[in-house]
Design a protein with these regions (language model features):
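Intrinsic disorder/low-complexity segments
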Residues: 1-35
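A short, solvent-exposed beta-edge/loop patch
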Residues: 35-48, 54-55, 146-244
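Intrinsically disordered, low-complexity segments enriched in proline/serine/threonine
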Residues: 18-21, 27, 72, 132, ...
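Short, solvent-exposed recognition patches
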Residues: 79-196
Length: 244
């Protein structure tokens, strides 16, 4: 019996039988039309519709390749480009990536930029949170907090993370880019995937992450400023590569 059915025994003594009962529903039938049963039916129908949508291929979205990402971003210029190891790519399963190091002025610590784009997150390929990836690479997260980021005339949030590995200390800034949204919270980003899959037949998105080392005796505010300046320049062009 379904979840909406009332549990217990049916009182046959109070259930009409015979020819006179054939033209009208029984009291037990009315029980099956209870609000709980109707709600269960709607939920089941919604789940079936969601499954059907998930099984449909999401349409390709026009975008520029990350290999074309600007080498000059405001006052920063690219000094190095790297490739991700094949075994790491097999785990992350991105559609497109870029890994670069940018510098602003001589003697200042570099800022690394990592962007991963996933064209379809309805199946195995999904954004991997740095909260998991950084510890997996041997980094210990010592602090994490959200900070404001200017985005499209308003304010969004990114994650500022301080990490350590032995004597090496770095500061990271990252967010999830979700169809024109800058999102700090991974669970909110996952909710947006389902929303956009229904509303727009899209489940694409990406991760944008910056990291910089602390110079000797450098304060966190100084390293944070370096990350924010490059992040602001990146936000000016990111929609070409991770579409709105």
């Amino acid at each position: 019996m379904g979840h909406g059915a009332v549990q217990g025994k049916v009182d046959l003594g109070n259930t009409p039988v015979g020819p006179r009962a054939a033209g009208r529903p029984s009291a037990f039938a009315f029980r099956l039309l209870s609000p709980t049963a109707l709600l269960f039916s709607y939920l089941l129908l919604g789940a079936l519709l969601a499954l059907a949508l998930l099984q449909r291929a999401t349409p390709a979205v026009a975008r520029a390749q990350l290999a074309e990402f600007p080498k000059e971003l405001g006052a920063f210029h690219m000094i190095q480009e790297s490739e991700i190891a094949p075994n790491i790519l097999a785990i992350l399963q991105p559609t497109d990536t870029v890994v670069r190091a940018y510098a602003r002025q001589p003697g200042e610590p570099l800022v690394s930029l990592y962007i991963a784009y996933h064209a379809d997150q309805s199946e195995g390929s999904r954004v991997h949170s740095p909260k998991s990836c950084l510890p997996g690479a041997g980094w210990q997260i010592t602090t994490i907090k959200t900070i404001p980021l200017a985005w499209k005339g308003g304010e969004s949030k990114g994650n500022l993370v301080r990490v350590e590995k032995g004597l090496d200390k770095q500061l990271a800034l990252y967010w999830i880019h979700s169809n024109g949204r800058v999102v700090a919270n991974e669970y909110v980003a996952r909710a947006y995937i389902f929303h956009d899959l229904f509303a727009r037949r899209r489940s694409d998105g990406g991760l944008v992450r910056f990291m910089t080392v602390f110079a000797p005796e450098e304060r966190e505010e100084s390293a944070k400023e370096r990350l924010l300046v490059l992040a602001e320049a990146t936000l000016q062009v990111i929609s070409r590569y991770i579409p709105d």
